[in-house]
Amino acid sequence: LFLDEFMEFKTECIEALRQPLEDGTIDITRNGIYHKFPADFQLIATMNPCPCGYGLEDGICRCTYHEKKRYLKKLSGPILDRFDMVLCLSKKEADTQKIQKEGQETSDQIKERIETTIQREKKLLKNYQCSDTSHLSHIQLNKLLHLSKECKEILDIAYQSGRITRRGMDKILKVALTIMLMENESEIKPIHLMEAMTFRNTGFIKEVLEYGR
């Protein structure tokens, strides 16, 4: 499911995504009759960082603090926690990526790397009744992973500083697990965790919502 201009949806529509993103199902009650429907999907949402769209460009944004706060308040903590990855991309970064073409992988090379990773993933999860790492429960994740002391310290520091929540911690571990599989490693290393954390960039949102409290 691809939702463009995510912030243009009504708050109640955004919040209604919480159950299907968490459980892979949706419950509907009509005329006293209860129905549960499957709703296991991958959600990709895009949005501008502020109403004018230039919130990540230094000196260009025309929005006031209150306009930004009102705009971003639709993104509740529980909704953010249900995204595995939150990426910010400024125009400067996008232009740089367009230029950096030399030495990049071809589509066929990327496809082969992904297929190899999927095979490793299936082998790893064969005893967990999961199709992929994203479907691992908190209990299954803890049983599967044996984190080093250094990895645990990295997560603890991030949690204590308020950078991540408990649910967000599971998301980071799942992304780190995928990175581990892509690099054909047998355990999650600190560098895998640090990379996974860079793919969970909610700083610009928290900065606006928490400023001036």
Question: Residue spans of the language-model regions?
Answer:
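Catalytic or ion-coupling anion/metal-binding cores of large enzyme and transporter domains
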Residues: 8
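Basic, amphipathic alpha-helical bundle interface domains used for macromolecular binding and assembly
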Residues: 12-213
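Conserved nucleotide-sensing/catalytic segment adjacent to the nucleotide-binding pocket
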Residues: 1, 11
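Walker B catalytic acidic pair
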Residues: 4-5, 16
